[in-house]
Amino acid sequence: MTHQYPPFYGVYLLQSTKKPLSCYVGSTPNPFRRIRQHNGDLKAGGAWRTKRAHLRPWSMVLIVNGFPSKISALKFEHALQHPNMTRLITTKDIKRKVPQKARALGTHLAFIRLLVRCSYFRRMHLRITFFRSHAHEAWEKNDYDVGSLPPQFQVETDYPSDEAEAPPSTVGSGELDINNRSIEEYLQKCRDAVSNDKQLTCYLSEKTLNISEGNVALCHNCDGAFDVAELAERFLNEEIPEELPFTTPSRHIIPIGGDCPSCLARMEWSNVIKGVLAMRPVLEDNKE
């Protein structure tokens, strides 16, 4: 069975519009459908806790995505739901104690920051998107003084066009990319390389690449092709401690990313692997 890199799988935070101190953590491949389930707009789905009338309707205030697998997303979700039970979170780098059992927005934001910093998640190319301005403002305040975040971690905002009048089930502007639209051209480039049985040479070692072995990485910006292992080693060797304040590069086998050796365009490792995995279904079809 071919491993499929999920186009989108995110961990979201809901906030009750009736009781703002009540929040709910969940995960989904489709936040647009999921919030409608929580609010009862769709009969199927939802969760027992979010069905309580005194808490409905709920508003989805943010989502974290960019996980390399559904399993890693579920691990993030579970840790955020049960911060008092997880071993992933450490509070040694914060100036104020975070109440473990509090369920308010600010507490959840502090735990998200701590999770993003932890050894399991800090090298992933994660992104947090805020759908409500008050949640982003609370994030920026960083009330619990959590330390700096990984340099590749992205913070984005995507508010409704009229936030004050937007229905609770509205998810930002409605333009959140849950289908890899932003890199579809690159993924198609990878598929076409297999379909056309293109002869490729590694830019680093100049050896002939056998694309049927599934170990070829392509640059999104130029014609550069690379052996995946050699490109990973190149990127890891280029990482320096000043760029990675949490750890030592030599301890890792998976890079965060680097500049294309051919054209110097930035290559995020998560996208490189998406391209590699996009080739595999085509390879399997060619074998049949």
Swiss-Prot record:
Main location: nucleus
One Pfam family from the record: GIY-YIG
One Gene Ontology term from the biological process aspect of the record: DNA-templated DNA replication
Cofactor(s) annotated in UniProt: a divalent metal cation
Main enzyme class: hydrolase
Gene3D superfamilies: GIY-YIG endonuclease (3.40.1440.10), Zinc/RING finger domain, C3HC4 (zinc finger) (3.30.40.10)
SUPFAM superfamilies: GIY-YIG endonuclease
Keywords carried by this UniProt record: DNA damage, DNA recombination, DNA repair, Endonuclease, Hydrolase, Nuclease, Nucleus
GO molecular function, one term: 5'-flap endonuclease activity
Family that this chain belongs to: Belongs to the SLX1 family.
HAMAP family, per the entry: Endonuc_su_Slx1
Protein name per Swiss-Prot or TrEMBL: Structure-specific endonuclease subunit SLX1
